[in-house]
Amino acid sequence: MSMNEDKLIQRDRMRFTKNTLSSSLALLAILFNVLYFVSIYRSDVGSYYYNIILGASVLCNLLFMLTVFLCSEGVKGYKASYAYVLLGIGALQILRIFILPMRAHGATVTLNQQEIVVMQTAQFVRVIVYLAASAVCCFVAGIVGIHKSRVLAAHMATLEQKVA
C-alpha cells in the first residue's frame, strides 16, 4: 500500500468515525473551568465575592459548561461551526482572567480590624493556569475540529466527483 492509499483510507474512515480528539479537548476545557470556579468559590474572604460580579460569574460558568458541552458533541460530528464557537469561547476564557481573578488579587478586605488579601498569589496563579488551560483546550479543539471538518468535506467532494 502506498502513502497516498493510506491517506485515502484514513480520510474515508473519517466518514464513519467520530472526531474524538476535539470532543475530548472540549470536555477537558470544562474540567479546567470546574477547577477554576471551585477554587474561586471555596475561598471565603469576608463578603468580597458576594456581589453582582459573583452572580455574573456563576451564570458565565453555567453558560460556558453548557455551550462547550454542546460544541463537544458538534465537533465530534465534524461540524465546523461548533469549532468556530470553541475558538470564540477560548478567547472569552482569556478575557475572564482580567475580570474576577485580577480584581480579587489586588483587593483587600478588613476583617476583625485586619487587612486581608482577598486572593493570595498562589491561588491567583492557580486560577490563571486553570483559565489559560481551559482556553488552550478550546483553541486546540477548535483548530483540530476546523481542520478535520475541511479534510472530510474535501474528501466527500472528491467522492461525489468520482460518482458523477
Identify the residue ranges that each predicted region occupies.
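Cytosolic juxtamembrane helix and N-cap/initiation of the first transmembrane helix
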Residues: 1-35, 144-150, 162-164
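Membrane-interface helix-boundary motifs at transmembrane edges
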Residues: 9-17, 46, 72-82
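Canonical alpha-helical transmembrane segments of integral membrane proteins
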Residues: 22-37, 59-61, 87-96
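Generic alpha-helical transmembrane segments
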Residues: 29, 50-68, 93-96, 133-134
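Interfacial non-cytosolic loop connecting adjacent transmembrane helices
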Residues: 41-53, 97-131
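Alpha-helical transmembrane segments in multipass membrane proteins, preferentially the mid-helix core
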Residues: 62-73, 140-148
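Loop-to-transmembrane helix junctions at the membrane interface
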Residues: 66-102
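Membrane-water interface at the C-terminal end of transmembrane alpha helices
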Residues: 129-156
